[in-house]
Amino acid sequence: MNDGENYWNAFRSHKRSATDGPTLSPWMVTVLQATKLLLFALCNIVLTLGSVFSKLIVLIMATNIVPRAHLIGKFARKCTKAAVRRTSTTTAGIYLSLLLIQCFPDTINLIRSGIDMWKGQCGQLVKSVVVLESLRAIGLAVLSFHVFPQLDLARCLVLSACFPLVAVLQRSLVAMVSAARTGRSFRNRLGRCFVAIPHVIMFLVLMSSCYVWALFDNKFTAIIALPIGVICTSAGFWESWIDTTHSGTSFDELYRLKYAVRKMNTTTKLIVSLMRIVCTVSVLVSAVYINDHKKLNSSHFVKAFFSFSTRQPHTRLLLLATGIIVLHFVMRGISRFLAALDLHPFSFVHPLSIAPLIAYGYVRYACQSPTCSIARRLARFGLHWVCDQWFQSARGIASPDFYICLIWLLVGCYRGWRLVRQRYFDTNEEIISSMPPVCNGLCIEQSLVVFQHSLNRQEKTMLTEEEDISDENDELRIRNDEVDRVSTVYGCATMWHETETEMRQVLRSILKLDVDHATRMNNKKANELRYRLEGHIFFDDAWEDVEEDGIEKRQPNEYFNMFFDLLNEMTGERLNEEGKMETRILVNTPYGGRLVVKLPSGTLLFVHLKDKKMIRHKKRWSQVMYMYYLLGHRIMDCPLSIEDRQQMADNTFILAIDGDSKFEPDALLRLLHLMNAKSDIGCACGRIHPIGNGIMVWYQKFEYAIAHWFQKAAEHVFGCVLCAPGCFSLFRASALMDDNIMHKYTKTASEPRHYVQYDQGEDRWLSTLLLKQGYRIEYAAASDAETYAPEGFEEFFNQRRRWTPSSIANTVDLLMDYKRASENNDAISYAYIAYQFLVIFFSMLGPAIIFTMLVFAQVAAFELRGSDVMLYNGIPIGFFIVLCFTTESNIQLIYAKYMSIAYAFVMLAVLVATSSQIVLETVLAPTSLFIVTMVGIFFFAACLHPKEFTNIIHGVVFFLMIPSTYVFLTLYSLINLNVITWGTREAVAKATGQKTKKAPMEQFIDRVIDIVKKGFRLISCREKKEHEERREKMEKKMQRMELALRSIESGADVKKILDATEEKEKREEETQTADFPIEENVEKTQKEIQKANRYVWMTSHSLKVCERGKLKSAEKVFWNELINAYLKPIKTTPAEMKAVAEGLASLRNQIAFTILLVNSLLALAIFLIQKHKNVLSIKFSPIKNFRWTKMNEMTGQYEETDEPLKIDPLGMGIVVFLLIILFVQTLGMLLHRLNTMIGAFQEVKNLYEYGVSPVINTKNDDERIMNNARLMINSLGVSTGHAADGYTRHRGEESDTGNVLYKLQKARLAKRMQRSALSTTE
């Protein structure tokens, strides 16, 4: 059988695609696993030893409150040289240190809550939490200030183990009530009684701690304080006796707070913090009087707090307390970190269960074998080690309370183990991890417990951020069921005149998404991240006029044809028996045309062909198209309730990409995961990697790297990202639909600054609108995407000419409106605004800073006079400024290119001069220290990004191009601010309808050719006139026939078309003899012909294989209304264009003059200060006996000197501010890398949970990898709240960024009522 195929020629060659396996290479998986194990071990050690250290320090301070002149301990007898000299100030220092340890976290919470309440964030007071936390504060303070001073260290430790008293009592009562319940058999009751007996015994044992020492004949006087302290602390430790059984009971609020089902609201936080501070201070005051400190008064407390001297014990005590506070914050952070990694300390080594035993063992050992080094260290703080308060007997004879104390210790450790023991959950369960919302400094182990809880289906509907429970019948209540988990993602790409390589790149990414989407939707595993996918490509200016056989047609241009051929090649679609492709449908639309494609795995891809004669072109208007089409027409116009449409908007996301973007499905999944974690995120963006070839791309690789490593990470950590790149960002639909965002994005430029802010950087403007409305923009470093960067010098400069003014304009706009931005957006604080102000301020001073650096480096390298070098450098830069004001861009770019090459050699001199300065002045000199620190930080950042480490190599190119980019590029961008053309891909001027400016020689040649052509026309005009008339008549007849044939194919009325054509010919003949045309009939005729021509493009050679479709009437109406409202092609008159040009020139002059003046003044000031360095400098010696090398002007030799360095105060100030910015960004980078590392650990864990090996076996594991490898992003450990912040599912109805559909509906109803009222009055 032969069907036309040669089976013998079935062998093939094709490009090998990247392996669809895990994104983490095997060596990275191994390193991450080893790092994870090491971190787990280190964190457990820090938690355990830190808890022991904290507990011992607190107890040592507490046992030293009351002087012990009557007691001579073992340490005192052995270590006579470590005598302790106590003063009243030292005693006041002990009191203040314990107060600081306990109340400092509460003070921080009080301040933060006050600020939040000032912003209007309140809530209903949870009284039970206030009462119990007050009891805990009273209990801990009573024990620390009244009871512990009368005990020794060992007895203090065993008494601390009795805090689970109420928890044991509760278990006893539950068991006894269960045994006494009616309806049970005798055997069942007897069995339950036996179960209750151990709990009753433990309760009685722990209860004995309230009175046992009062039975002995000793000097213990805190008989009343002891039971009060133990019972209050035990009752206040409510996390130990509240569990899941209290859900729905009178303790339901406590249950929700413990398991982070609900956050502790601002009002409750403030009152709890205030009451804890008041209770602690009150108990401290009472202790000062009851403990009979005869010489202690308020002046001693004031002196202890304000008199700072590291030689005094009270200052050392306060510093020690500060160290303990820092340790507590670190341990709380470590506990949260382990919870985020889903790594919990082993139950038997948790601080709550093991710290008392370790501390007790160490105290017993130290008391049996006293070490004088401990005594000497404690003596420096005015403290001593208290071993045995009473019953000082011979060696080997135990005290009467020894055994009962040991039982307390064992019972307390057992109850601690029961509280922190690990629970095992099914992989399909949704787990919440939480920590106690209050930090207890005097008993830190209680604040290090991580609780886990599995949400059942009923509880999921009650998850809120605040305390108000949604009404079950509320129309706007959003349910969290399985349907909510399936998100809808619209992938929207904007194209113009991309190359074949760029188109192939974005198509390959879309096809990978198609496969991943189908795999996930078909896989029904619980808790798997699934999404619906639909692709949209908006082809800007995709049409051109083509004249064929004398007939002018409007057809898709060569770029779309190239895209269509490429799409067929990559999808492998074949023709059916009728010679058609069933998966390709062509549709006429009011904006041009549309190609609908069904991808191999079922995803629909809509290719929108925009005609600039029918709709506005450029990227911003394409974005307006898909926003209004997908969010307005698809969501707002659908016949659903407000609740359902709100749910659609919350679960709908737009993936904005460029026509050359390249990314993996995992990158999208990471962004989706981030968006699902927090509801206030309006947009999430990934790490953009520039690709391409050439020196300019190398420069951009390093530039992008440090921008993401430092600036973007710092923005993410300390505030929020200011710009979401349009090449790869995920937007939440409900955020875009909110007020002052999508609608305001349609605003056309009416002022000169609007052209810069709106049209030159549309991505930055959209980001600014989101930030002002209160939405966060977050950055996910692990979500990688690639895009082609400009490879040529001119294209790079033109790109930055657009970006720089737009970035500055939008940042200034945000800073000028900082009050509203800070009020609406919780992520934007005044400190963050100040940081952004510093960044933009120093970026504007970049030319002056780099210019002066070049000058002084050349002075040092070539040993020239500073004034001469400043003149030599000032002339070329000044000449470039003149060129920017007076000449065309191409001349400016040619000059900038050659000067960039020249200054690259100058930078080598800078490198030599800087190296010599470091050698001569040593690394400790301020300038040398700054340079070495900056280089070290860059290298450290590269080490923290191992996958991107090679970018550090491109830092050499970045260094050589510093003058080019920080001087010439900055000046070029600002002075050409009035040029609003894009400047990239300008080779295709044919499509834009504009002619590019030609060189003078080209213009001369064109004039000569025109003259020759006109001469030939004059010679042959008479001979060809009659021939031309006959030919025109023939062409008109052929045109009529061709129109008729094509009209038959399209189903149009042939007679009507022919009549219209004849009428048009008659009108043309009449217009040749008449003095005026009949315009209305001509326009009508043209419309008829245009209507017939609408189907001509579908019959082109490449597109005739596609099926034909028809737009639905509702969608056609929508597009017509949208175009009329926002997207009509903008027609400007010459007068309007002149006014715009003049306005832009005026704006350019103002801004350029200001920046040039400031930079000139700064450069001159630095130069003059350096010239008069001997008078206007600051003398600085980094260390004592500092020596450096200096040239002797008399001998010309280098000699060592001990003279102080002479520092320029202005330059030093700039260096200090730059260092501050760099350190802030480095801190932000470290915190962001920690967050990214948590995600990487989670991926490694999920790799093995879903059965994916990090080593790819392409022979046996292809199918398994296809089904499982993409599941590794679905980690619940990070998305659920693993700290005191609680579990966030959605925001409350009162939120400004919540229920967008409800707000829009209210506005619509208000307009309707207003119109009806007006009509009534009329």
Curated annotation (Swiss-Prot):
Glycosylation positions in this chain: N297
Top-tier EC class: transferase
Positions on the Cytoplasmic side per record topology: 61-128, 178-193, 243-269, 338-342, 418-836, 887-892, 944-951, 1170-1209
Disruption phenotype: RNAi-mediated knockdown causes the production of abnormal eggs characterized by a spherical morphology, the absence of the eggshell chitin layer, increased permeability to small molecules and a failure to divide. Loss of polar body formation and loss of egg-3 and mbk-2 cortical localization in oocytes. RNAi-mediated knockdown causes polyspermy in 40 percent of animals and a failure to internalize egg-1 after oocyte fertilization. Simultaneous RNAi-mediated knockdown with mat-1 prevents the formation of the eggshell chitin layer.
Enzyme Commission (EC) number: 2.4.1.16
GO cellular component, one term: plasma membrane
Transmembrane region(s): 40-60, 129-149, 157-177, 194-214, 222-242, 270-290, 317-337, 343-363, 397-417, 837-857, 866-886, 893-913, 923-943, 952-972, 1149-1169, 1210-1230
Principal localisation: membrane
Extracellular face of the membrane: 1-39, 150-156, 215-221, 291-316, 364-396, 858-865, 914-922, 973-1148, 1231-1322
Membrane protein topology class: Multi-pass membrane protein
GO BP, one annotated term: chitin biosynthetic process
Subcellular location field: Cell membrane
Known function: Essential for the embryonic synthesis of chitin, a component of the eggshell.
Protein's name according to its UniProt entry: Chitin synthase chs-1
Biological source species: Caenorhabditis elegans
Annotated gene: chs-1
